[in-house]
Structure formats: structure tokens, C-alpha cells
Amino acid sequence: MTWRSEHIWIDLISGSRKKSNFCWAFLLFLGSLGFVLVGTSSYLGRNLISSFPPQQITFFPQGLVMSFYGIAGLFISCYLWCTILWNVGSGYDLFDRKEGIVRIFRWGFPGKSRRIVLRFLMKDIQSDRTEVKEGVSARRVPYMEIRGQGAIPLIRTDENFTTRREIEQKAAELAYFLRVPIEVF
């Protein structure tokens, strides 16, 4: 979501609370829970899953391996749910032409550096750069080239833009607002 006025431009970044992340975390939790239940039922010799008799899988090695994969999947699912809960990666990009300041804010993982804030002056912006790579794993990333700090990515590639035209349009609008040249690679 973008909000603009004559002197201020604010881009809100959604972070990890997206439908796809919810789906992956939920499916991974269910699948890994199923693996743990199958491994446990093969160890106990009891039928914990009604559609699956425990005699079909021996505990060593199949049940043990399924339990291991299930526990690993539960850890990964827990990690995904924590990133969703903490909304890692969300934040905003603020461009204030009146004050001459750019502020990029993102939420990180809990700890000392939970709040990630980058501040710099607009006069230090050299250009608005867009990197476009076509192919199987296509990437479209807008960067801001800062004097002394290099290129800073503005948004994640999977967030808002689906076509090359959309990202180039957004980069052109931002370059016009900031009054800097635009580069497309």
C-alpha cells in the first residue's frame, strides 16, 4: 500500500503475514504431525491413526525415520508460525522531501535489533535502480543507490509486483518523486 502527498511518500510493507505463509505453515504442521503420529504408533504398536494399521511399518528403520522427519517438520513449522506472529519483514519506507530525509523501517526477530531503521539524507541518493532477471526464477527488485552505503533493496520481490511493467512504473514514479535518475538492469 502506498500513500503520497506533495512532500511525503510512504510505502507500507506487508512482511510475513501473507496467505501463502499461513498455508505453508499449516500444511507443514499437519504433515509433520502425521509423520510423528505414524512413527509413534509404529513404536507403541497401537493404532493412533485410524486409517493406518501400525503393523505395516516397523519402528526400525521406517518408524524412526518418519518420527525424525516429523519432529524436524514441527520445528520448521514452529519457526514459520513465529515469523508470522512477529510479522518479520513488515514496516515502511518513508520519503520526506520537505525534511530531505529517507527512513526505511522493518520489524526483525525479537532481540536487541528487533527494530531495523535506516535513515539517510535525500541528497545522498544517487539513483533509483531496478534489477530485472527473467527466466525460471525471475527476480524484480527495486534498489536505491546511496552514496557511501551501496544499493539498498526497497521491497521484497514476491510482494506486490507481478510484471516487469508494474515494477518499472513504480520505480519511475519514485525516481520522479525523489528527483533522481533511474537505472534498469
Swiss-Prot record:
It holds the Pfam family Ycf4. The gene is ycf4. It is found in: Plastid, Chloroplast thylakoid membrane. InterPro entries: PSI_Ycf4_assembly (IPR003359). This is Photosystem I assembly protein Ycf4. It is a multi-pass membrane protein. GO terms for biological process: photosynthesis. Belongs to the Ycf4 family. It comes from the Eukaryota. Seems to be required for the assembly of the photosystem I complex. Disulfide bonds: none annotated. Keywords: Chloroplast, Membrane, Photosynthesis, Plastid, Thylakoid, Transmembrane, Transmembrane helix. The chain crosses the membrane at residues 21-43, 63-85. GO terms for cellular component: chloroplast thylakoid membrane; photosystem I. HAMAP family: Ycf4.
